């Protein structure tokens, strides 16, 4: 009897050890593919090691891909491996929904699917020699504007809607605001594919003003660039979404990573890299770094109607308002 019990205990011990070894192997073999827009690489260089130090992140490794948000979305649709996508704006995630790659309820999750916020800023030469402070200043003759192409860069779409919405807020009619957009694009000297490429172009000495994310201006200053930036009085709240792919073979780990990114510790890392936290307590703790603007509006306000209306009206590559403007100035729409 004792011999039979001993054999049973040995079998159970062996089975438990095998299960533990199997779980350890799965943990060690877990690799998440992160596909993101062009700017947050420096933040993720800190966030990923911080996640790996948590129980959920132990043994999880990452592959990372960064580029223009629209291009990244199209690349995932074309087959670029991805478990997690962090893109510039909702339409680029919605394109993945239409392709059957992301759950339609991605924006019903915590914080409506948003992981960071930002605002549009004007990055200027040291001393602001052209005295640029307002959206109207961008229309002055002789002002050279650096703005990425809105048909590849999500950041550029935020820039365009920040400009259009601000002019509408000033009392301009739709037609007048569209006319101002044309004047703005006539002053654009370089249209790069992404916000990061546009920043590099500006830092190389081209242009008088760069339209970009607040985080890009802060990143440039952290690296010692002699630039300054202005947050216009009327501005748009930029909301950067994140989602897990439906076909991910590591959904549990991917969702654990998303939950980690919204912890106070992770949100502080984002704040350190120039991104406005979505967790209110962390945003309040960094209030001096991220000044409030009374004229801040969202893509759902001022009659804009949200991205579901803005995307086709402004950015349809064939019939959109901005596509028509690009054709007039000789720009690309794809």
Segments the model singles out, each with a brief description of its role:
Residues 2, 252-334:
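Extracellular/periplasmic juxtamembrane helices and adjacent flexible linkers that interface
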Residues 127-133, 152, 165-173, 247-254:
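Short helix-loop capping/hinge motifs at secondary-structure junctions, enriched
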Residues 1-31, 334:
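Short, low-complexity disordered leader/linker segments with a strong preference
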